[in-house]
């Protein structure tokens, strides 16, 4: 069909167009093309009645839902030039007949098939037009006149009739529904072919009216001829060939070929160009090289090129002139002269439901309910288009509601329930529950029925609001895990309680202040968990931190459980024979009233007492945070009141800072034995008191000396167990990052390891503050604190290095202090309540003793400044300090501190 090899020539301009892109366009369809395609499908033959009608209906329904308007073209009387082609087609389809082919030029059978299709188009309301001759000629006429946007046909003759856009290879598969598009503008711009050239190709290559064309001429020679003409009309060249004799050809002047340079391809030799230059290259010497495709502009090359082109044209001319009737003016007139006219205006009508039921039942044997179901989509689409354009009447379908939203082929749609239209047939089984449902595009339905869409959107919002109200609030108001992690990352909790083992402590986690939480809960919770009632031994920083942040109950329970498990394990290593020998137990009157508790039972009773206390505290802790702030704030106020009593008695003539520090000093020095307090009075002057110095450091040093004197071998026995738990701290004096509070916490734990001595364990509250603030506020004092702490560690090293069983290693000394602290926790806990009551009975005496100790310790600090290394200086200064103050040994006594204080109060 059409021009031979035309689609192969037009292949470079083919475009792949999805059917969705045809939406909104009007397409002229060659009806005979679709009928022939349906008849060639072998699977439909015999299994489907009237396959051409079924194929036509479903294609129309598919394209109509895509908003593609169709105009079908009916074949007219074929021209006589096509009689030979029609006869051969009929013979191939229906077999040979006895009549002559020249007498049978009509399409009686094919026209009867087309009439059935036209009857269906009338039932569907689709317009169709009658062509005068060929259907493709009418399609081209409609396209050229602007009545349609393109022509849907596989016949290439459409371009020869004047069509501008042709759609070919209509495909309706689910994966890729598309058509191939060819436009006349792209053919002319890319291939250089216009309508005259295409008609000339039809004559040379062959078409329906001239099946053989010019024998011996193929598409390559024909295209080369068109290129030789350079835009000249091919049909005019045919007429010129006909006017002149076919055997005559213009004689070209023969010129002699000159020698050409191998470098520039110009006449002359390379040596000549090297000496004299090239005239065509416009050079005095040498010449310019050119590529292989360069054509020399000399006279011989021009004549040679013309000769070659003329040979191609002469060859085609000879073959064309040999054909009888060339240049076939009848064929040229068939393509160029228009015979078609538009008789009636193209109009679309509403599908007729009753007429369609009758037609499909008669021709296709469709049941009425099936025909109504298939036609409903076309009815709703037509009514929506009319309402969108502003035309409304009572016959239009009315939607009941929007069932739900759908997505079809990537397009947002609504599932619509419609009212039953007139003459709509239903299946017998559907009378009970019947609903007319279709899926329509959201944009089109909203434009046609905006009020229905508004109601649906309102109902959707109401349902969404009800669902949100039904959501119950979470019963558990605990923060989310992400919030807890963010909360803990800004927290700095520094527990310095003496009874907590550093390695197993669960309180060394950072806590940041939160303004929304009560500030008294942490302080009170820790005090209620760790301290017995009426314990006066508080850290100095409790007076500065009036309130702390709440601590998670889970952390408190975890810490308490670890303490119970740790305290329940017996520590047999503390009963060392060397330690007992150094205590001089033979000189003690065991029958007297000097000891309130038996030393033999002290270690065993501690673990049970501590375990019972911790378990009682854990049982009192609720699961939430409702009652904790009030309970804990009461405990904090009780301890703060005891501290204020000490400060109020000696506040005359002293600044608030000095007054506060002096009260702290009393709390720190009251833990020292009587020997150490008298020892510090006699060894240091009274006029070097500096309140800014860490007063806890002096008490730590003094108690440590007592600890070392009584537990030398006991410390050595624990060197090989807990060393990994304590990190070494070898920082120099210039370190500004090491915090004094942390060093005090680590060193002060050592001081409680005095066996069989009644000394209160000082429980320090948590220093809760931001890390940067804590570092900035304590930089000035941290330098002095760091040096003193390191010096005190050296004292412990000096004492233990003298033992035969211990090695002079600083790490072992630190390990020893850890075990000393751990062993002292067990037998000192039972004296919390008893010793705490008597300590605050004489605040004035303790304050005076503290002032003397501070002045004395400042002198020792000045002596240590001459040593560059902190460890060596602390060792030497302590040894000199011991030698010069042997006078205080006369006050040595084996009695515990509590009994000595008791005797002193009686004497005064």
From Swiss-Prot:
Residues 390-464 are annotated as: Chromodomain. Residues 2-96 are annotated as: XPG-N domain. One of its GO terms (cellular component) is centrosome. Mg(2+) 1 binds at residues 30, 75, 134, 136. Mg(2+) 2 binds at residues 155, 157, 208. Changing residue 109 to E: Strongly reduces endonuclease activity on both Hollyday junctions and 5' flap substrates. Residues 122-208 are annotated as: XPG-I domain. Residues 208-384 are annotated as: 5'-3' exonuclease domain. Pfam families: Chromo_2, XPG_I, XPG_N. GO terms for biological process: double-strand break repair via homologous recombination; positive regulation of mitotic cell cycle spindle assembly checkpoint; regulation of centrosome duplication; replication fork processing; resolution of DNA recombination intermediates; resolution of mitotic recombination intermediates. Changing residue 30 to N: Abolishes endonuclease activity on both Hollyday junctions and 5' flap substrates. The modification Phosphoserine is found at residues 801-802. GO terms for molecular function: 5'-flap endonuclease activity; crossover junction DNA endonuclease activity; four-way junction DNA binding; magnesium ion binding; protein homodimerization activity. Its EC number is 3.1.-.-. It is an enzyme of class 3 (hydrolase). Changing residue 89 to E: No effect on endonuclease activity on Hollyday junctions. Slightly reduces endonuclease activity on 5' flap substrates. Its cofactor is Mg(2+). It comes from the Eukaryota. Binds 2 magnesium ions per subunit. They probably participate in the reaction catalyzed by the enzyme. May bind an additional third magnesium ion after substrate binding. Its main location: nucleus. XPG-N, XPG-I,5'-3' exonuclease domains interact with DNA. Contains a chromodomain that acts as additional DNA interaction site and is required for efficient DNA recognition and cleavage. Endonuclease which resolves Holliday junctions (HJs) by the introduction of symmetrically related cuts across the junction point, to produce nicked duplex products in which the nicks can be readily ligated. Four-way DNA intermediates, also known as Holliday junctions, are formed during homologous recombination and DNA repair, and their resolution is necessary for proper chromosome segregation. Cleaves HJs by a nick and counter-nick mechanism involving dual coordinated incisions that lead to the formation of ligatable nicked duplex products. Largely monomeric, dimerizes on the Holliday junction and the first nick occurs upon dimerization at the junction. Belongs to the XPG/RAD2 endonuclease family. GEN subfamily. This is Flap endonuclease GEN homolog 1. It comes from Homo sapiens (Human).
